[in-house]
Amino acid sequence: MTRERHRCPKSNTTGAAGNQAPAEGRAKGRKAREMAITEDRVGSADLANGGSTTMKVRKRNGDLEPVDVNKIVRAVERCADGLAGVDPMRVATRTISGLCDGATTEELDELSIRTSAAFIVEEPNYSRLAARLLATVIDKEVRNQDIHSFSQSVAMGVDEGLIGSDVAEFVATNARKLNDTIEADRDHLFEFFGLRTVYDRYLLRHPEDRKVVETPQYFFLRVACGLSASPEEAIRFYRLISSLEYLPSSPTLFNSGTSHPQMSSCYLLDSPEDSLDGIYKRYADIAKLSKFAGGIGVAWHRIRSKGSLIRGTNGLSNGIVPWLKTLDSSVAAVNQGGRRKGAACVYLESWHSDIEDFLDLRENTGDPQRRTHNLNLANWVPDLFMERVEKDWQWSLFDPAKVPHLTDLYGPAFEAAYLKAEEEGNYERQVPARELYSRMMRSLAQTGNGWMTFKDASNLKCNQTGTEGRVVHLSNLCTEILEVTDQDETAVCNLGSVNLGTLVTDGAFNFERLAEVVRLAVPFLDRVIDINYYPTHEASKSNSAWRPVGMGLMGLQDVFFKLGLPFDSPEAREISARISEEIYFNALWASTELAQAAGSPHDNYALTRASKGDLQFDLWGVEPSDPSRWDGLKARIAEHGLRNSLLIAIAPTATIASIAGCCECIEPQVSNLFKRETLSGEFLQINRYLVRELQQRGLWNEAMANRVKMAEGSIQEVEDMPEDLKEVYRTAWEIPMRSLIDMAADRGAYIDQSQSLNLFMESPTIGKLSSMYLHAWKAGVKTTYYLRSRPATRINKTTIGGPIGGGESVEKPSFTDAEAVSCSLENPEACEACD
């Protein structure tokens, strides 16, 4: 039965311990507490007024009315129905105590929400209570604009220029069916911070008064309608995303169904040609792409290095830094649809002779004209460089004006061309490979930037590079997208992620439902390609010909919590690999169905490795779990082809994971204690899975909560914490990075693009980082993302002598950076410099 109007259900009040009281006792207790609160607040003389007080609130129409204490209590109780451990009276008491005479009803609503959120640190179900209270506020805000159905919300959006004409016509034609689809109770699936994120950032707002014109469920259905050709499709997709089992990426959520349907997440641009026209065209392209919420990756390999002769003027080049400084300012100036700052990552090949200046761009000291604090940086590293690091050989640095062909080569062809250029003496200078590698490690340790991405693995294991001349020149802003680019093609990708945490039922992971979710989602990812607004011709051309998409995942840590598995256990590693295999298999199957329905594969199918029978695991040399099943799929691919050249990419999912109420992508949790920030304030939250475990064992109380808070996120030293829980609830700082890398490599055989692989090191040293990234390269990982550290001080203490702070001094290091690299490579299991 459809429920358009959002109301919290009738209350079955629960006590602080979560036990349901008998109805009679509940009523008596409630009456007594109401009287106590009212008496304390306004005096016993007001009790005769039935809980009304001399304090007044201002209604939305401007009228003043007395505060009705009992009305506040009942409103909270309705929203607390079925929430064990939640005390509505406590919330009401705190709300009333913070109320000021003459406050507006909006302020009263916001105060009750903030009050509920403040208790989340003690009992996770207060998050659901705060979310339900917020949902009622959103509902009132929408209805006060005379919007009472989904179709009316869309009509309002059309009047204000927010909704696209095609979607407006689609909704008007199918209004009754679509209105009946709304399931308002699905708002109860949200945790508070997820719904707050939706309210603050995603719901469409009136352009003048900034009131929201859609509820969360209208929002989901609007997104679905923007990607659907029939009401049946829209209903199917609405039910999928409103269940939070799957969510499209932020650009799709922002823009689907709107007058500017730019729904792609990522744009990858080849290096500009080495000319003024080429560079300034690239600036313009990036600004256009960034304007509508696209994240940017751009290569800078072709731009000549510092000191290079400019024949047209007989002058010398200043190198890449001034150009990147201009790009830095441009990126910061472009606001992505008013929702977030523009963002870009610049990639540079390790043989470029400006590489050392490039690595300094994010430093906090030095000439500000040679620093770019808005750009992210990534190293595009060939295997030959890593091999020379291992062998402790020299590395030659080149001016791309002299060796322009190196940018478009990889694997054996690159190595041959590099060696030839080296033999001919075309290099600008030579440096010890380990010295340059240590500078890369230092950049990572000090800034978290200068990500290590591996050129040869990215090309040799990419489906799009099945024909000579097709080259991957870079990854994207978050290092999970790997697609070919050239001057005429800007690579594009549309993303979405399965919420794995919703797929654990009765103590087991539901692989059957995973398959269903993936097969439902892929057609809608593909649909974005045809509907999308493309800011540049090069982006439209590339996306239409290759039709790549990026199906990802989030909530892997939630799966392990629900199954009681340590993140790095053999069982967790096996489940992680199987999940990736199932997603890849079912995404490919769905793509063959799309090709069959369309009557043809994507335009460039003949250029791919899949057209020759090679899938991702073949390129890794890995045998899947059930080869006969894969043989059947390969036969389907041979018959129908694939509608999409690429299908799998694991994005960071920071924002949509917050909406879904799960942990980000493939990452372990970084803490058991979180500080959540919203537009209405900051709130503490303790890992809800940990709290539930402790409650079930009778160990959760105020003292335990305080011990967990005092431990600042780690529970390893918390008194009375069971040892098995310490294993399961370790943080990213307490899990060996070798395990994280090995799990990434396991799933990599089923990821035809890449994965945003953050690595964590509490106190990074050159030696530790050297060993870690060498292991990632040897494991076949294509890309890595941020290095996360806390605090970023150990690197300074181990490499810099002299006074620190208030005159203290530290012992001079026993190892130089180069010695630390050498030690870590030659003694990987027992490196003194890594201690």
Name these PLM-found stretches:
Residues 169-197, 479-484, 525-530, 623-627, ...:
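Catalytic alpha/beta core of large soluble enzyme barrels
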Residues 517-540, 548, 566-653, 709, ...:
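Internal maturation/activation junctions in enzymes
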Residues 26-53, 86-221, 238:
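Core nucleic-acid recognition elements
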Residues 127-158, 381, 458-486, 549, ...:
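Terminal amphipathic helices with adjacent charged low-complexity linkers/tails
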Residues 181-197, 201, 228-259, 287, ...:
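Conserved oxyanion/phosphate-binding beta-strand-loop segments in alpha/beta enzyme cores
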Residues 360, 375-440, 444-447:
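Polar, glycine-rich mid-to-C-terminal structural blocks
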Residues 204, 218, 223-312, 316, ...:
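Function-dense linear segments that define catalytic or interfacial modules
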Residues 8, 24-49, 794-835:
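Acidic, low-complexity intrinsically disordered tails
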